[in-house]
Swiss-Prot record:
<keyword id="KW-0325">Glycoprotein</keyword>
<keyword id="KW-0430">Lectin</keyword>
<dbReference type="InterPro" id="IPR042916">
    <property type="entry name" value="CLEC12A/B"/>
</dbReference>
<comment type="function">
    <text>Inhibitory receptor postulated to negatively regulate immune and non-immune functions. Upon phosphorylation, recruits SH2 domain-containing PTPN6 and PTPN11 phosphatases to its ITIM motif and antagonizes activation signals. Although it inhibits KLRK1/NKG2D-mediated signaling, it does not bind known ligands of KLRK1/NKG2D and therefore is not its inhibitory counterpart. May limit activation of myeloid cell subsets in response to infection or tissue inflammation. May protect target cells against natural killer cell-mediated lysis.</text>
</comment>
<feature type="glycosylation site" description="N-linked (GlcNAc...) asparagine">
    <location>
        <position position="176"/>
    </location>
</feature>
<dbReference type="Pfam" id="PF00059">
    <property type="entry name" value="Lectin_C"/>
</dbReference>
<dbReference type="InterPro" id="IPR033992">
    <property type="entry name" value="NKR-like_CTLD"/>
</dbReference>
<feature type="topological domain" description="Extracellular">
    <location>
        <begin position="65"/>
        <end position="276"/>
    </location>
</feature>
<keyword id="KW-0597">Phosphoprotein</keyword>
<dbReference type="GO" id="GO:0019903">
    <property type="term" value="F:protein phosphatase binding"/>
</dbReference>
<dbReference type="GO" id="GO:0009897">
    <property type="term" value="C:external side of plasma membrane"/>
</dbReference>
<comment type="subunit">
    <text>Homodimer. Interacts (via ITIM motif) with PTPN6. Interacts (via ITIM motif) with PTPN11; this interaction triggers dephosphorylation and activation of PTPN11.</text>
</comment>
<feature type="modified residue" description="Phosphotyrosine">
    <location>
        <position position="7"/>
    </location>
</feature>
<keyword id="KW-0472">Membrane</keyword>
<feature type="disulfide bond">
    <location>
        <begin position="242"/>
        <end position="255"/>
    </location>
</feature>
<feature type="glycosylation site" description="N-linked (GlcNAc...) asparagine">
    <location>
        <position position="237"/>
    </location>
</feature>
<dbReference type="GO" id="GO:0097325">
    <property type="term" value="P:melanocyte proliferation"/>
</dbReference>
Length: 276
């Protein structure tokens, strides 16, 4: 009796296994690919797109190196680069549409694209800087005319005008900007390096706030102590009024004094199409 039951069980298991195999074969015949096949296709698509982006990045780097010595002959190369970037953007959209049903793969793809495009943007900024230095025949203008460009900001030096701190602040507001805020020692060095008059005095966006009894920039943030020398920091702690910039140093004066000023606003994004 037990032998009959064992034989029946084995026969049933074999028939179930055979049925499962038959079902899988039917699914394949109907056009449903195996999971491993789908993953291989997704991985291949990701790899292809990343390679294309890397090729564009390398092309951009080569163009930048060549521009240093051949700035006047780069308009055709920049046009070619613009076409490459547009093709990459089209490919990105097409690839993303294919992986909507694969969240993990889609997020990985987006992170890789974001990283590569960020590096392309950095190279585009360098190219724009070279264009501004070496030629006037270009469309790359992240700042208005008469403004200076540094990193992500534009600066306006009111050299031939003098106003009180409140009126200087208003003038900057009329230009959709603020009195300059110094965020780093590098920015401080940039301001000091500008070709300015022999005795330049420029208002900064730093003033004493009597209500909070502290020094504040126009965005209500407090200045970092690392921006000041020991002398500057001691002067600020002992004084009240408005801050001005002279020969690379920060001083304090009464806000009613009339001197020049510096406005600052965010620079426009550098676009590839602006480089031709």
């Amino acid at each position: 009796m037990s032998e009959d039951m064992t034989y029946a069980t084995l026969t049933f298991q074999d028939s179930v296994a055979a049925g499962n195999n038959q079902d899988r074969n039917n699914l394949r015949k109907r056009g449903y690919p195996a999971p491993s096949s789908i993953w291989r296709q997704a991985a291949l698509g990701l790899l292809t797109l990343c390679v294309m982006l890397l090729i564009g990045l390398v092309t951009l780097g080569i163009m930048f190196l060549q521009m240093s010595s051949e700035i006047n002959s780069d308009s055709d190369k920049l046009t070619q680069l613009q076409k490459i970037i547009h093709q990459q953007q089209d490919n990105i959209s097409q690839q993303l549409s294919k992986y909507r049903n694969f969240p993990v793969e889609e997020e990985f793809l987006k992170s890789q694209i974001s990283s590569l495009l960020k590096r392309q943007g950095q190279m585009a900024i360098k190219l724009c800087q070279e264009l501004i230095i070496h030629t006037s025949d270009h469309k790359c203008n992240p700042c208005p005319k008469t403004w200076k460009w540094y990193q992500t900001s534009c600066y306006y030096f009111a050299v031939n005008e003098e106003k009180t701190w409140p009126n200087s602040r208003k003038n900057c507001m009329d230009k959709n900007s603020t009195l300059v805020k110094i965020d780093s020692l590098e920015e401080k060095d940039f301001l000091r390096s500008q070709p300015l008059p022999k005795f330049p005095f420029f208002w900064l966006g730093l003033s004493w706030d009597p209500s909070g009894r502290s020094w504040l920039w126009e965005d209500s943030s407090r200045p970092s102590p690392s921006l000041f020398s020991a002398y500057e920091y001691a002067q600020i702690n002992e004084s009240k009024g408005c801050a001005y910039f002279q020969n690379g140093n920060i001083y304090i004066s009464r806000c009613s004094a009339e001197i020049s000023w510096i406005c600052e606003k965010t620079a426009a994004l550098v676009k590839i199409e602006d480089l031709d």
